[in-house]
Amino acid sequence: MRTPRQPGNLDLGVVGNCSFSALVDARARVVWSCLPGFDGDPAFCDLLEPTAHDGGYFSVEIDHFAASEQAYLDNTAILRTVLHDDRGGAIEVLDYAPRFKHHERIYHPVMLVRRLRPLSGSPRVRIRLRPLRSWGAQVPERRVGSNHVRWLLDDWNLRLTTDVPLPLVLDEHPFLLDRESHLVLGPDETLPQGLAGFGR
């Protein structure tokens, strides 16, 4: 069952690339995204507060949260969220949907890139990735690879590729964010280049 929480805030950032879109709240939580297209099943549907399961979101949380700020990087569609803890620690979360030239064509995959970076102190973060399927009614089956995990949705397989140790993501354990880290969420395919290069 879900734990009680404050009513949802509709002051949301939008990330997209004409193939993919997501709504991100002020605390760096993806609360809405339909997959694999805009008219698809909302794997991230926390905006509607589904009651059947505690899921439908993709959050990057800082322990001892104190405050946050959110804005777009100048002249870009890159959403920057800074999370502060009450001990002087801070992290930056950059969210964007990539769009680039590939084989002489503009490539805009169904994909979200999340780049995490420590800014100050010794911030401890927790990643919670809990997609749902069938319009929030069911928890999808999960399968684990060497540096990725995938969820079997109704019409599509969702894959997270990351340089964060997978047990920390799978078990939602807090960890010290002491270096830049990358989370790439998209189709169940191998990335065309290295994770760090792809996340830039």
Regions found by a protein language model. Give the residues of each.
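Beta-sandwich/jelly-roll carbohydrate-recognition scaffolds of carbohydrate-active enzymes
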Residues: 2-200
